Amino acid sequence: MEVEKDWIRPRENTVEALVYGMINSDGVELDLRLTEDDMLVLHHDSKTEFGEYPECLTINDLPEYVETMDKLLENKDFIRRWTEEGAFTCIEFKTPHPSSGKAGGWFNGREKEQHMIKMIQKLDELLQPIERSSSSTVIYSFDPKIISASKKINTNLEFSRLRPNIRSWGNWTTQRIIATPSFLANSLPKLIDRQREEGSPMLPCSLQYLKGIESKINIGWTVGLEGKKLDRLTKYRRGYPIYVWPAKSDSERLLLDAGLTGLTDDLSPNSVTLDSGHARWIKPATQPLTDEMRKELDETPMGEHASKISELQEEIPSWYELSDSERRNFVEKWKKKWLWEREIGTLLSETAESSLPWEVSRIIGHRGTGKSHRGGS
């Protein structure tokens, strides 16, 4: 793998960024908003860079950098990875800023739910022609209305909640301050219980629940990424999927070794060595390493990481290229290592050349190849 000095990260939530992330990792996370003329567009912030609310503009009035979900779904490389090669897509629904006057403004929860329902209907319509695995996609939101809205629609899509609840208004510092009481009152095991009760297939959460001072001060069982705290987490979740943001260079390997999924803001081809000193492997699910290959990579001198990664990328088969027995061996190994509770028959029903079980640990490109500004998740 040669160092690509001229590589420039594409703008977040663009088709270019999302296709790159889909091809070069195990999947992507993207953000959707609903325009005035009911188009789903790829956009994170509550305002455009010109200070306008996307929900108050038609598709023709939005800045040129804002692209549609329709355009993304026209990309053959994105669809191939998603439907044929086992890559995953996390879709985050963003609610309008209350001052936009959309979705009930500051107080009308019922209108906010209706807004969510319309977004679900629009997305469901777009995805109907696409033959995807049932374990390839999740739709989530910080807004709790995502769950009640999903239960009022006949859809096969899977839904979850982002926790803690981050408001759709204010800067990132303000949002974190307001979310602090929710964070302190809920340990990660408690959140897992709530997600299970709601029927969510996975839990998206902040790294704060697992690492740093914040992980030690919330009420309830404390869990973590090392030692006894990791043992406690593994036994408690029993394979329940946890998607963690941000998967920084000093925590990415810890997340993977814990059997969790990390959402990364760094998919640069030049990022070949993690802060932990390990050689980086960003397709642990869709190009999985055997224990022998992992050991070989770990023992590679740091100065040779780039060339060794390039060599293994050429040698190691992708998930869709494995035989049924090879895929089964991986699933059985992962089930044993991380104490997955679901029966092997159920896991194998989600296992094929184009799909993997929900429990599988991945690296996901946040907003494609990483966020482009200092805003929140």
Language-model features: locations:
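Phosphate-group recognition and catalysis centered on beta-loop-alpha active-site segments
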Residues: 1-377
